[in-house]
Amino acid sequence: YYDLNRSPIKEDTMAAIERHRWPDPYDSGRYRGLRERARELHKETDFAVVLQVNCAFFLRCAELRGWENFYMDLAGNPKFACALMDRYLDIRLRIAEKALEEVGDNIDIVMVSSDDLGMNDRTILSPKMYSELIKPRQKRTFDFFKDRTPAKRFYHCDGAIYPIIEDLIE
């Protein structure tokens, strides 16, 4: 557990998204040893092998902008919020694609996301806002993995999400 100290994207502009120093999804150091370790665990143990590529775009974008700013973006500047989520997700999916190439069929489960969409008593966003802004990106994410690996997909979400559970199952 950690507390967010500073959010790096201060402005709600496309230029701010472009200026941000995004990670290089093709940095070979990110994947060093992944193929060998996955193969070893798959062949030499009885454990389920889980690839953790967490594409939690909702929470990460809230951290990039600051929680309050991001929620304001979703409500008042959805074009910017969607551009930020799309940029983040593009990078995470490139990382996932490269990781999947490395591990091949040596995984049993892929950790798709851990976006917390609920609070103690309700969803963070209205079901309408979820459906319009978040669900299409989740669908893109889930379809990405469904199309690339037979591994089971693992999705984690905290909170009271009953109003959107059918959307998540879909």
PLM region descriptions:
Residues P8-M14:
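Active-site phosphate/oxyanion-binding loops
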Residues S7-P8, D24:
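Long, hydrophobic/aromatic-enriched structural stretches that serve as scaffold segments
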Residues A15-E170:
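Active-site loop segments of alpha/beta catalytic cores
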